[in-house]
Amino acid sequence: MSINDQRLTRRVEDLYASDAQFAAASPNEAITQAIDQPGVALPQLIRMVMEGYADRPALGQRALRFVTDPDSGRTMVELLPRFETITYRELWARAGTLATALSAEPAIRPGDRVCVLGFNSVDYTTIDIALIRLGAVSVPLQTSAPVTGLRPIVTETEPTMIATSIDNLGDAVEVLAGHAPARLVVFDYHGKVDTHREAVEAARARLAGSVTIDTLAELIERGRALPATPIADSADDALALLIYTSGSTGAPKGAMYRESQVMSFWRKSSGWFEPSGYPSITLNFMPMSHVGGRQVLYGTLSNGGTAYFVAKSDLSTLFEDLALVRPTELCFVPRIWDMVFAEFHSEVDRRLVDGADRAALEAQVKAELRENVLGGRFVMALTGSAPISAEMTAWVESLLADVHLVEGYGSTEAGMVLNDGMVRRPAVIDYKLVDVPELGYFGTDQPYPRGELLVKTQTMFPGYYQRPDVTAEVFDPDGFYRTGDIMAKVGPDQFVYLDRRNNVLKLSQGEFIAVSKLEAVFGDSPLVRQIFIYGNSARAYPLAVVVPSGDALSRHGIENLKPVISESLQEVARAAGLQSYEIPRDFIIETTPFTLENGLLTGIRKLARPQLKKFYGERLERLYTELADSQSNELRELRQSGPDAPVLPTLCRAAAALLGSTAADVRPDAHFADLGGDSLSALSLANLLHEIFGVDVPVGVIVSPASDLRALADHIEAARTGVRRPSFASIHGRSATEVHASDLTLDKFIDAATLAAAPNLPAPSAQVRTVLLTGATGFLGRYLALEWLDRMDLVNGKLICLVRARSDEEAQARLDATFDSGDPYLVRHYRELGAGRLEVLAGDKGEADLGLDRVTWQRLADTVDLIVDPAALVNHVLPYSQLFGPNAAGTAELLRLALTGKRKPYIYTSTIAVGEQIPPEAFTEDADIRAISPTRRIDDSYANGYANSKWAGEVLLREAHEQCGLPVTVFRCDMILADTSYTGQLNLPDMFTRLMLSLAATGIAPGSFYELDAHGNRQRAHYDGLPVEFVAEAICTLGTHSPDRFVTYHVMNPYDDGIGLDEFVDWLNSPTSGSGCTIQRIADYGEWLQRFETSLRALPDRQRHASLLPLLHNYREPAKPICGSIAPTDQFRAAVQEAKIGPDKDIPHLTAAIIAKYISNLRLLGLL
């Protein structure tokens, strides 16, 4: 027995002697042996556990109390610093009562599928066990998946019932658009909580007459009054569970689990979990849609332990929950260990003072983490689901002291395969390595055989639900499962993970990179002769080995070459549209080329990857370690010394540390995006700057084209010395998960004197002669600029455009470039209209005083007659907290201008997406946004932050109208399409442009983009989009028609005209369209999608990055045909008709000319 094993044994003995809860949770060997006996059915197995441990605590979750706000009268939930538990007896009885209720009509019968959407909890576990009692098939849905990803699963499984947590009720209701079961059950529901009750009431109203909605409590109460339902008959081969997985690409596919496999979650002998024999007290944070979540939960219950659940699914309470639970088992994924590691460094950096003994402080902090955060009584630790770096493993084991960190390897399909690289016996029946010649891996390799690992296991899944074709692909002719992982066999039954067979590498943050394609991109650099991209799945970025060109060596010399090559790689990456995580963070310069002779090229001159990894792998891994150490040291130094250091140098160092550059490479005049930063790394920089300087720096400011690092430093200086501006934290609370319209009052944004004077200001000018326009470089904004220039020409007026830039001259140049798209008439028209009528100012609506000097701001306050505001930071990933500054506070800043000097009518461009959290029947054009959407969720769903930020702007405008009499017109736009007048003007990043390019570039389309009817025919459908010229004219015309009112328009195409995506393909194929396209239709949608994706991935880089590929998940299944508009447009259409807007004096239909224009414009821009 090793010293560590001896220490662990003594640790366990001490815990048995000193910790009553630990001792009371000791597993009963008789029960363990009984449930391991053959012939025991799954429901009987669970009954043995529940009755055998009847009086023990089975499940625990945080205690709650209900708190009523004295101002609003609304009741909410507050977490208490303790857990409440239910016993095994109570859990079994509760599940039985629920099963009885679910047996009543509409009854759930054996074999029925039931989808469950929610995070793991006592209620979730109750439902899961009830379904087992009924013989139903549980289909856990991923709460992180978008509705578009859930619908195909619901459609495929056709559930009899959907159970959803209250937090996911909105998504569940949306999912029902594809398949509507008879019953929807809501769990984790508290009737006293206003938001819970209102959500259920809204769902019932929306689904009235089609779906029965019950809360779990109502069903259990109903079940108590009914005769108990007997446990359903079961069979080992009966389907019991579907776990949906899609890997890195492809449509979701459901891995089938028979009852015998589900039993393996409960049995010690199955190999799913480590059979320690110690008490199991666990904190459960993994979802039930992941096999890891089920392993931990049911492994705990079968061991007679207590399974506690984290209080919040976003893990924001993880450390608090850990400290309260004091688990005996730490079953974490690498990301959780990363969080513990970050907490350690943060605490060490916080306490470290000059002259302190760092090693002693680190030991002290580790001891405190071990006892106070992790609870101090763990006896087992496991990591799995993704690779973990050797450095992190070593650090974790130093933290855990006497406990070894077990690294598990397995899959949804095969179960657990390896522990610490060793084959799990008897769970693994057989395995083999097969050669992968295209990657250079062979069983004859020395010193160890290498190849793809194929396995047979006791827990092997039988296949994917209703997907025999995909099932066949993952098994070889001998019945071995293809793991897709390249392994080296380093000893008997011992393996080391090397790579993915498809050479697509998953980085630690979950992003995938295709190394061969990146090598092709970076090989285009004139300074690069050869390049080998190297990645490690435990790291967030790749590295490289670069062989410089002969010219680069002779011109720069080896000693000066690295920064020059680094800059060249960044330039190539920008040109190819690469993401920051695809760019090598650092590289080794190799002056000896890769050749056939030195074994670093294959016979067909491809990179010999195994040999390259063997030759350079150790050096590259050392480079990873050096970079991590350097970054950690630099960030620690910045947190300690940054507050007292000059801002600009500190900012440059912070940007360099986060992006993996050297401070010498980061110039003050560099833009963050030019250094390889994106919106997510900008978010990390914003958080770091807040830690260093104690000020909020919005992501919008960091990524603004007007903000180089020097400008960012100026922003920080101003924020430190000046008056703090409104922020998400000051308005809603830094950690808010819900925001309220009542938070957004004008007095929090605008000084009292301005507000007091506003109602008595001179009325708006009778004639508009001076217009202030934001967002003129945007797609809609440029057309608004042309429209207003044309109108100002008639009245000898002026258009003032506010453009983000460092100077007025640069702002003018940015706006000029917007119109220079290859159409000489457009350029000439713009210049003629602008002569004497156009003023361009460098400014930003998100900045104090719009980023203008005081004299200029006052001039605008005195002279502007109308404000037109289409400007916004449009980002569908960033949270509301980061979009608050540019989109909400920026609107307030413009309102301050609108309410100074004289009242200036305000035209605001919003988005139809604000309606996503509003019941459809309430989402009308004349409703007050504060009334129909008083509270908004903050979550990580698609575009949640952007929609909330535009909602906030609407709320502020309503406030300004009500309090100050400000005329406001809001235009909620949906898809805005290209015009037919000008050449080259496209909104390249939008989904529709990407679709048109992709159809033309691949030459294939599905038989229909929509679901077919019962006879397999195309259905009538409608696509909601309007040409940008019409939208601009409508905004400019209607925006000035209501001088004293607050008016909202839904700018949408409302027609049931049968003009949809299928008709667009017809038009492209028509000889009369002039598109020059020939697009082949493929009847089978799945076949089209597969060929389409393959073709897109094979496109040249520039085309591929402009293609539909990043948004292809929206097309995984045929769309449900919609005829007409998703929101009412009566007010908008009546106003358009009355004002006779557009050629038709009405909302236009989409035409073949618009679709053909996309193709001609894409050709002009060199994308086709």
Curated annotation (Swiss-Prot):
What keywords appear on the UniProt entry? ATP-binding, Fatty acid metabolism, Ligase, Lipid metabolism, NADP, Nucleotide-binding, Oxidoreductase, Phosphopantetheine, Phosphoprotein
Carrier domain: residues covered: 645-720
Question: CDD domains, per this entry?
Answer: AFD_CAR-like, SDR_e1
Described function: Catalyzes the ATP- and NADPH-dependent reduction of carboxylic acids to the corresponding aldehydes. In vitro, also catalyzes the activation of medium/long-chain fatty acids as acyl-adenylates (acyl-AMP).
- Domains as described in the record: The N-terminal domain likely catalyzes substrate activation by formation of an initial acyl-AMP intermediate, the central region contains the phosphopantetheine attachment site, and the C-terminal domain catalyzes the reduction by NADPH of the intermediate thioester formed from the attack of the phosphopantetheine thiol at the carbonyl carbon of acyl-AMP.
Q: Which residues bind AMP?
A: 290, 385, 407-408, 412, 485, 497-500, 506, 606
The record's section on Gene3D superfamilies has:
ACP-like, N-terminal domain of ligase-like, NAD(P)-binding Rossmann-like Domain
InterPro entries under this entry? ACP-like_sf, AMP-binding_CS, AMP-dep_synth/lig_dom, ANL_N_sf, CAR, Far_NAD-bd, NAD(P)-bd_dom_sf, PKS_PP-bd
Name of the protein? Carboxylic acid reductase
Q: Which domain of life is it from?
A: Bacteria
* In-chain residues carrying the UniProt-annotated modification O-(pantetheine 4'-phosphoryl)serine: 679
The record's Gene Ontology biological-process terms are:
biosynthetic process
Gene symbol of the encoding locus: car
